[in-house]
UniProtKB/Swiss-Prot annotation:
GO molecular function, one term: pyridoxal phosphate binding
Keyword Cell division: no
Protein's organism: Myxococcus xanthus (strain DK1622)
Pfam families: KYNU_C
Keyword Magnesium included in the entry's annotation: no
Subunit (UniProt): Homodimer.
Enzyme class: hydrolase
Listed EC numbers: 3.7.1.3
Entry protein name: Kynureninase
Alphabetically ordered keywords of this record: Hydrolase, Pyridine nucleotide biosynthesis, Pyridoxal phosphate
Cofactor(s) needed for function: pyridoxal 5'-phosphate
Record PTM N6-(pyridoxal phosphate)lysine, positions in chain: 249
Gene name of this polypeptide: kynU
């Protein structure tokens, strides 16, 4: 246990922490599903699908009304003209990931954006053709990387280089990542890692990895699916070439929601960087002249293909406004304390009942703790559900619990662990 807080194992202490929480009011900005008893559930699955912001339905309804009232004229008129609607979330998203607005665009979904970024930043040569990834990355990332390698005529078994934990360990050591880059960097075209591993909950040192990879001449990209809205990110300063993320997890924009893209400012005006092109990435001043020659917008917007879905943007806007109001510094501070309290309580359960596989160092994790339990985990998951507690299961034997600082409370964490304790003592 490495958290610097003094905690107590009592419901009164959990309620005291909630009363002192400056962010507690944001909980009321979300809809909580009812549990079996009709009361709001303890929802610890924001790392899988975030809760619905109360403003989401209103924002979507506004656009439905403008569509009914204006038809095609809604692109230029209405409360929020659709032609520029995506720009309403650009600055919010940029602050969220520590970037400049020029470097960020909201579009598509994560796997689509990852492919678009690899078109530009995976440029294999005979000597430098490998992609460095983490073993056990989210499957869609694995599929995308392997298919890009095959598209360029290489065998994925030779061109995909995996980072694996040491024998007997479950997470990667930063020094091992950096040593692998130093040893193999001359043959690596792209370093492509997650910011937080979806299964272990381990967060990586983006700045150190980027610096090491750039020193060896590699492009660098990150999947922020479990980082955006969870970690305090500094993409511009850390300097990766690109990053992609989804917004249905910690960003609470709904199932299948739009993703985001970061392209570093140094590439903003690079005309000869290959990319797939579409009309929405064309210069706004001449887009509707419908000319035959593509002229890319500067920055991340130049990678857009199509005009974005307005209703999805409306849902995302409802959530990003809350993040902007709360601020990632305050949210991350609460998150460290909230997950630290979860860790403290789990450590007090009967010995051998549960093992935390996520790093104990708060700098190497976000909100999520990945848990391995003695016995069959899916039965325990059902018991939690029957008690009005929602977390999720990942094969082979991991239950993930992720208290989200925007809407979870210390009492939520206490109730979760006390339910586990009842199961452990039976």
């Amino acid at each position: 246990m490495t958290t610097p807080y003094l905690f107590e194992d009592s419901e009164s202490f959990a309620r005291k922490l909630d009363a002192e929480d400056a962010l507690r009011g944001y909980r009321d900005a979300f809809h909580f599903p009812p549990g079996p008893d009709g009361k709001p559930v303890v929802y610890l699955a924001g790392n899988s699908l975030g809760l619905q912001p109360r403003n989401a339905a209103r924002y979507i309804q506004e656009e439905l009304e403008d569509w009914a009232r204006l038809g095609v004229e809604g692109h230029h008129h209405g409360r929020h003209p659709w032609l520029h609607y995506h720009e309403l979330v650009t600055e919010h998203a940029a602050r969220l990931v520590g970037a400049k607005p020029l470097e960020v665009v909201v579009m598509n979904t994560l796997s689509v954006n990852l492919h678009l970024m690899m078109v530009s930043f995976y440029r294999p040569t005979k000597q430098r053709f490998k992609i460095l990834v983490e073993a056990g990355a989210f499957p869609s990332d694995q599929y995308a990387v392997a298919s890009q390698v095959r598209f360029h005529g290489y065998d994925a078994r030779e061109a995909v280089l995996e980072l694996k934990p040491r024998e007997g360990e479950e997470t990667l050591r930063t020094e091992d990542i950096l040593e692998t880059i130093e040893r193999h960097g001359h043959e690596v075209a792209l370093v492509m890692l997650g910011s937080v591993n979806y299964l272990t909950g381990q967060a990586f040192d983006l700045a150190a990895i980027t610096k090491a990879a750039h020193a060896k001449g590699c492009f660098v990209g990150f999947d922020l699916a479990h980082g955006a809205g969870n970690l305090r990110l500094s993409l511009h300063d850390d300097g990766p070439d690109f990053a992609v993320w989804c917004s249905y997890k910690y960003l609470n924009a709904g199932p299948g929601a739009l993703g985001g893209v970061f392209v570093h400012e140094r590439h903003a005006h690079t005309k000869d960087l290959p990319r797939f092109e579409g009309w929405w990435g064309h210069d706004k001043q001449t887009r509707f002249q419908m000319g035959p020659t593509f002229s890319a917008l500067p920055g991340a917007e130049g990678w857009q293909l199509s005009n974005p879905p307005i209703f999805q943007l409306a849902a995302l806007r409802a959530s990003l406004e809350l993040f902007d109001q709360a601020g990632m510094a305050a949210l991350r501070a609460k998150s460290e304390r909230l997950t630290g309290y979860l860790e403290f309580l789990l450590d007090r359960l009967p010995e051998g009942f549960v093992r935390i596989t996520t790093p104990r160092d708060v700098k190497q994790r976000g909100a999520q703790l990945s848990l391995r339990f003695r016995g069959e985990p899916q039965g325990l998951l059902k018991r939690l559900g029957d008690a009005g507690i929602i977390c999720d299961f990942r094969k082979p034997d991991i239950i993930r619990a992720a208290p989200a600082p925007l809407y979870n409370s210390f009492t939520d964490v206490y109730r979760f662990v006390k339910t586990l304790e009842g199961h452990a003592r039976e």
